[in-house]
Structures are given as C-alpha cells and as structure tokens.
Amino acid sequence: MDIEKIYKEHGAFLEGHFLLSSGNHSQFYLQSAKILEFPWIAGELANELFNVIKNAGIEFDSVCSPALGGILAGYELAKSAHKRFIFTERVDKKMTLRRGFSVSKGEKFIVCEDIITTGGSALESAKIIESLGGEVVAFAALANRGFCAVQNLGNERKESCKLPFNKPLFTLGNFEFDIYEPENCPLCKTGSVAIKPGSRGN
C-alpha cells in the first residue's frame, strides 16, 4: 500500500508554512482528516494496519487514541480487530481519560494515532493507561513522520522521538521532511507567517 500516494490523491499532503503542534515549523503538513472523511478508505487503511500488527504477533485487548486527530484512526483499527476503543483528551492542556472510560488491570492496549511525529501525545495516553493498571503493548499510526523507529519499516530512531525504546511502533509508511525550530525557520526568514492547521490549542 502506497500511503504517500493516498495522502496526495486526497489532498492530505499539504505544502505551505505550518506551525506544528510541537511548536516547530514545516513546509509540509499531513492532514489525515482529508482521508478519514471517507469511511471506506479509513477502513481499508485500518485493515492493512491491523494485518501488520497481527503478522508481528502482537496480541491486545483494546485500542486507545489521543483526541482529536487519533480518534478516527484508532476507532477504525479497533473495528478491524473487533476490540474495544477508548480515547484520551486534553482538559486545561492536560491529557485525561473521561466520559466513563475505564482501564482494567492487565488490559493490553495499542495506542493509535493518525500521524506519529515525535509521539508526545501518544506517550501521554500510554502513561494514563499504565497509571490505571493497563499495559501498552505497542503503538500504531497510519503514518510516521520519520522521527520514531517503525518495526515493520526498519527506519532508524531519531533523537527527538519520545516513544519508549521497548515498545514497537507500526505504521503504513514514513513521510520524512524537514522540521525547523521557529528561530531557525528559513520560511520565516522570507517573511512568511506559519499557520496552525492541527491539533493542540485549536
């Protein structure tokens, strides 16, 4: 499956000057919502991702995603696997588990995102699950921004990845493009202003 082709065909691979949820800047942005608005495509991607996870021998009971971007990807993965789905969300900038969701002691989870950049939000969700007695057995996403090592793709881990070393990450593909700290952004130096299309703070 050519995940980059799918993103480009559906207008989900954006070019411009973007302020990422991490606070850094990039010339490119992956807007997964443009793909996930088509349920049949979301289902196909989730089926493919579940097969990757299953073929790796990973067994799990439930899927958890950080809101907002990860919800549809995680829900579809849980649907493909016939597993329970819950999500975490930010309240006053702190990731929390609400809405009556619970975690059983020893319950095995996959934390699923639409896109993994550094993995910060996924890690926050994982810490909540583990604090409640659950076990995170793996991370998953439709695509990886190239910073974290993906078990099924064999790419190298970079220093900015926040995911734990001892938990595998599974995705359908890598998108690798430059990310800049605001003070070193070449786009800013041309007078361009970064726009924020994504998650935190919106």
UniProtKB/Swiss-Prot annotation:
It catalyses: orotidine 5'-phosphate + diphosphate = orotate + 5-phospho-alpha-D-ribose 1-diphosphate. Keywords: Glycosyltransferase, Magnesium, Pyrimidine biosynthesis, Transferase. GO terms for biological process: 'de novo' UMP biosynthetic process; pyrimidine nucleobase biosynthetic process. 5-phospho-alpha-D-ribose 1-diphosphate binds at K93, E113, D114, I115, I116, T117, T118, G119, G120, S121. CDD domains: PRTases_typeI (cd06223). Its cofactor is Mg(2+). Orotate binds at T117, R145. One of its GO terms (molecular function) is orotate phosphoribosyltransferase activity. It is an enzyme of class 2 (transferase). Pathway: Pyrimidine metabolism; UMP biosynthesis via de novo pathway; UMP from orotate: step 1/2. Its EC number is 2.4.2.10. The keyword Glycosyltransferase applies. InterPro entries: OPRT (IPR023031), Orotate_PRibTrfase_bac (IPR006273), PRibTrfase_dom (IPR000836), PRTase-like (IPR029057). HAMAP family: PyrE (MF_01208). Homodimer. Catalyzes the transfer of a ribosyl phosphate group from 5-phosphoribose 1-diphosphate to orotate, leading to the formation of orotidine monophosphate (OMP). Belongs to the purine/pyrimidine phosphoribosyltransferase family. PyrE subfamily. This is Orotate phosphoribosyltransferase. It comes from Campylobacter hominis (strain ATCC BAA-381 / DSM 21671 / CCUG 45161 / LMG 19568 / NCTC 13146 / CH001A). The gene is pyrE.
